[in-house]
């Protein structure tokens, strides 16, 4: 039995939840495969790690050098000794340093062939005699000249005492070698390159010398060469910056390197204030994308200018000696690079975003297959749909993320184990909520799964690649503005990448040097705080925008309505039972039956209540101009009243406006003008309530392939607020009425149904819950004659307390089911009446068909003219002729007598006399209407 109390929010949510739960059970293995994707990806990462360990981490080049000191009798090494003395420069980094050696603080000077010089550059470069240039500027030129003179020592200090480092500290020593990542061993000392002693002027006794380097276990002599230093004054810092820039290969047209050793801006330095800016070459830090940064030899530059200023204040001989640099002791180490931390940001960006295409295609699939709208037409509101769908996506995403963290930790990925799990989970939770909101938001822009899938995967892989090769490069670049980093993080893919980058950095540092991973105490020191704020704000903004665009797209409202001087939610111009707005446009001349229908509607509009289920008053639909085409008037002022218990059939050629009318009545589009009411409810104001009392059988079957027929009816029955035994009884009766109950057919998946069975199920869905109004679009399409008759019987039985509007191309179906018919042509209702009335009104003739030998065709024409002078030939081919004979001119008995008499004169192969059919009426009305439209 019907329960016309609308289903509440939680009843609708419960219906959808049960349906989705059943649907997901049938697709359990798809969900399992989705959830275990992180496991396979983590295993892949472990495999890459094993290969990396074999080729890189455990390579002899990445551990302290060793030498065999004792061999066994079989020639195999019995004892190894490892230490600095057996190591190359690369291997030395991994050796134990219980007592790291003190090292000379060296100044970085350009190579001879790249030094900037005011002299004959080509000549001095060929001989290697170009001086080392130091640039200075400042506000006080005289003070600058003094400090410039004090920068380089004019004396040379060197003796063979044990305090050789202190003695060397009096000299300005430099190297062309770049520094390393640590100060355990300096490449400038260990390499074969000489050390340069920068002097204002080189003399024969200071040109070349050597000193012993005795720092256990290393002992060797190091050559020191004198190089001339040249201090040059510039007017301001802009000149220095331009000169340094032009010294880079890309900074000049000749692509020649002109490098200076150091540059100083003394600014407002005076006797009471020491304020200096130092230029240095930051490119020596190495690749900005490398997680380890090399030292740059800035300390010696600072010491030089500081000593020069001290001499200015205190006189010559006053110095702060920079004796040496020395690292802290360390044990022997090995290379411990973890791939999960190295490639973690891009890899896990892809892993987490893999859920996005799944969610987006799921939403677009329901829209493409019209499943969303058919659920809405049967009473499912937007709120319950959003809540249940969002909850499902969130649940599957949480399980996915938890599995990722569990699998990653179980197989030992330090990316997960070294960072606080609570921080990780909250970050992932926020990211997946933002991801779900964006999926809802962008789903409105797609109507096909293929397009949505391609766009989603472009977003997934594009975010990872752009994050790794663009965003990370800019993030680690010191010159890129931080404000632009914040702006880039507004892109969800980059905010996800930034969070994963922070996790990988903390895990990498802990793995490399034993520092702690990311903890809550580090939260404010990292970028995670700003990332959390960005994601939270974007989550709510995207969710609101998604709900807005969904409402706009589903109601056909212009998304920029708020920029116009009109209300998009403007209701119908005339409420049912109240005052009716009079159209300013004159109504064209109409047929009497159509005019009578319009008058009846006008009277109904003045009444407070009627027994009519559907009332349409001057309903119009005009499609706006598009792509240069004029506007299209699909429905032209339709007035129609359908009482309860009546089946109204709509006939018409393609493009007549039937579909546009049905779409307006079912809420798929808004009327341009006019009003329509379903049991007193305005389709513009109260469509959500209207949906609770209507049923729809669309032209194409909208079913879930894995749900059974019974499960379909249970779902839609719950949406009609049927519960308990009433629901079970209604489902059983519906299955029996469409012959889907016996033989276990009701419990088979709909995907295994034949086309006719699916059609019958669609009709049963539209009728369950005894809706007040049912719209059926060609309900018996594709059915065999027996099934068609059975279905018609079910529909006829259901219309006792239901108003049905039915569209069909089958005249037999229209005559059997419909109490009244309306023929639609060019958006207008051309005639209204029951089938017998229409045939009597528009079919006032008989059709005589006669087949004879071709030579007797003239005899047949003469025969017909004798019977009816106004008869018209409507068909003629190969001896077969058809004539339309007006009924008022002839009696059937006269035709029979004339034919029997004619048989005596010529041979008649076959003949027949038929009354006008409904199809003849339809064709006649359609042709007449189209002809009048052409000449109007």
Swiss-Prot record:
Domain of life: Eukaryota
Cellular compartment(s): Membrane
Membrane topology: Multi-pass membrane protein
PROSITE patterns hit by this protein: ABC_TRANSPORTER_1, ABC_TRANSPORTER_2
Residues given in the record as ATP binding sites: 652-659
One GO MF term: ATP hydrolysis activity
UniProt KW keywords: ATP-binding, Membrane, Nucleotide-binding, Transmembrane, Transmembrane helix, Transport
Annotated TM spans: 34-54, 340-360, 393-413, 422-442, 454-474, 484-501, 527-547
Family note: Belongs to the ABC transporter superfamily. ABCA family. CPR flippase (TC 3.A.1.211) subfamily.
PANTHER family tied to this protein: ABC TRANSPORTER A FAMILY MEMBER 3-RELATED, ATP-BINDING CASSETTE TRANSPORTER SUBFAMILY A ABCA
This protein's name: ABC transporter A family member 5
Source taxonomy: Eukaryota, Viridiplantae, Streptophyta, Embryophyta, Tracheophyta
């Amino acid at each position: 039995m019907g329960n016309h109390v609308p289903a509440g929010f939680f009843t609708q949510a419960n219906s959808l939840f049960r349906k989705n739960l059943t649907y997901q059970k049938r697709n359990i293995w798809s969900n399992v495969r989705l959830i275990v994707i992180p496991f396979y990806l983590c295993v892949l990462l472990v495999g890459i790690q094993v290969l990396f360990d074999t080729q890189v981490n455990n390579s002899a080049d990445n551990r302290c050098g060793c030498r065999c000191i004792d061999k066994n009798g079989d020639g195999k090494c019995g004892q190894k000794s490892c230490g600095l003395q057996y190591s190359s420069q690369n291997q030395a980094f991994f050796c134990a340093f219980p007592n790291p050696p003190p090292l000379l603080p060296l100044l970085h000077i350009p190579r001879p062939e790249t030094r900037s010089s005011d002299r004959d550059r080509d000549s001095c470069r060929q001989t290697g005699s170009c001086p080392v240039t130091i640039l200075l500027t400042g506000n006080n030129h005289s003070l600058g000249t003094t400090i410039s003179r004090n920068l380089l020592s004019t004396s040379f200090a060197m003796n063979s005492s044990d305090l050789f480092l202190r003695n060397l500290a009096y000299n300005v020593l430099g190297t062309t070698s770049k520094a390393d990542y640590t100060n355990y061993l300096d490449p400038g000392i260990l390499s074969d390159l000489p050390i340069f002693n920068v002097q204002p002027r080189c003399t024969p006794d200071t040109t070349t010398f050597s000193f012993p380097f005795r720092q256990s276990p290393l002992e060797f002599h190091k050559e020191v060469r004198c190089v001339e230093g040249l201090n040059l004054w510039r007017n301001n810092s802009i000149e220095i910056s331009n000169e340094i820039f032009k010294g880079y290969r890309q900074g000049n047209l000749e692509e020649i390197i002109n490098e200076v050793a150091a540059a100083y801006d003394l600014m407002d330095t005076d006797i009471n204030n020491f304020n200096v800016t130092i230029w240095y070459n930051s490119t020596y830090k190495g690749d900005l994308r490398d997680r380890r940064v090399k030292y740059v030899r800035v300390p010696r530059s600072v010491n030089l200018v500081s000593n020069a200023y001290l001499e200015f204040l205190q006189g010559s001989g006053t110095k702060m000696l920079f004796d040496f640099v020395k690292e802290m002791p360390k044990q022997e180490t090995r290379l411990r690079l973890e791939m999960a931390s190295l490639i973690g940001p891009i890899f896990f960006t892809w892993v987490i975003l893999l859920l996005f295409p799944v969610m987006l295609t799921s939403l677009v699939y329901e829209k493409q297959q019209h499943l969303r709208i058919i659920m809405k037409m049967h009473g499912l509101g937007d709120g319950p749909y959003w809540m249940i769908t969002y909850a499902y996506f969130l649940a599957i995403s949480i399980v996915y993320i938890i599995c990722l963290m569990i699998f990653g930790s179980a197989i030992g990925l330090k990316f997960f184990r070294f960072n606080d799990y609570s921080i990780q989970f909250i970050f992932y939770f926020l990211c997946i909520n933002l991801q779900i909101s964006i999926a809802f938001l962008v789903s409105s822009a797609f109507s096909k799964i293929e397009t949505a899938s391609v766009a989603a995967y472009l977003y997934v892989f594009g975010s990872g690649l752009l994050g790794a090769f663009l965003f990370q490069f800019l993030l680690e670049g010191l010159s890129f503005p931080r404000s632009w980093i914040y702006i880039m993080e507004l892109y969800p893919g980059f905010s996800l990448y930034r969070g994963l980058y922070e996790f990988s950095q903390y895990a990498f540092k802990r793995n490399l040097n034993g520092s702690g991973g990311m903890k809550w105490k580090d939260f404010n020191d990292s970028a995670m705080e700003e990332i959390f704020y960005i994601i939270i704000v974007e989550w709510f903004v995207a969710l609101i925008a998604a709900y807005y665009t969904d409402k706009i797209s589903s109601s056909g409202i212009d998304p920029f309505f708020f920029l116009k001087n009109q209300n998009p939610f403007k209701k119908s111009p005339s409420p049912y039972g109240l005052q009716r707005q009079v159209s300013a446009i004159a109504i064209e001349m109409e047929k009497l039956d159509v005019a009578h229908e319009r008058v009846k509607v006008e009277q109904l509009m003045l009444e407070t209540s009627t027994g009519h289920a559907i009332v349409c008053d001057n309903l119009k639909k005009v499609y706006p101009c598009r792509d240069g085409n004029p506007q299209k008037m699909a429905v032209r002022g339709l007035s129609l009243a359908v009482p309860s218990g009546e089946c109204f059939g709509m006939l018409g050629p393609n493009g007549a406006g039937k579909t546009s009318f049905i779409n307006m009545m079912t809420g798929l589009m808004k009327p341009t003008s006019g009003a329509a009411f379903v049991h007193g409810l305005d389709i513009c104001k109260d469509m959500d309530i209207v949906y609770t009392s209507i049923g729809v059988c669309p032209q194409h079957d909208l079913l879930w392939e894995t749900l059974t027929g019974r499960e379909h009816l249970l779902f839609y029955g719950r949406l009609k607020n049927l519960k308990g035994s009433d629901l079970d009884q209604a489902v059983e009766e519906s299955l029996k009425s469409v012959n889907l109950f016996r033989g276990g057919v009701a419990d088979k998946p709909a995907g295994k149904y034949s086309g006719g069975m699916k059609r019958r199920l669609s009709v049963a869905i539209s009728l369950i819950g005894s809706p007040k109004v049912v719209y059926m679009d060609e309900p018996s399409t594709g059915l065999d004659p027996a099934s068609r008759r059975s279905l018609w019987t079910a529909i006829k039985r259901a219309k006792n307390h239901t108003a049905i509007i039915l569209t069909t191309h089958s005249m037999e179906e229209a005559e059997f089911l419909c109490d009244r018919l309306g023929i639609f042509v060019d958006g207008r209702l051309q005639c209204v009446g029951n089938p017998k009335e229409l045939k009597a009104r528009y079919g006032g003739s008989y059709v005589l068909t006669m087949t004879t030998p071709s030579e007797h065709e003239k005899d047949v024409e003469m025969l017909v003219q004798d019977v009816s002078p106004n008869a018209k030939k409507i068909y003629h081919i190969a001896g077969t002729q058809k004539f339309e004979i007006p009924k008022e001119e002839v009696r059937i008995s006269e035709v029979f007598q004339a034919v029997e008499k004619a048989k005596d004169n010529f041979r008649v192969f076959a003949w027949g006399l038929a009354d006008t059919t409904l199809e003849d009426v339809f064709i006649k009305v359609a042709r007449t209407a189209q002809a009048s439209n052409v000449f109007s």
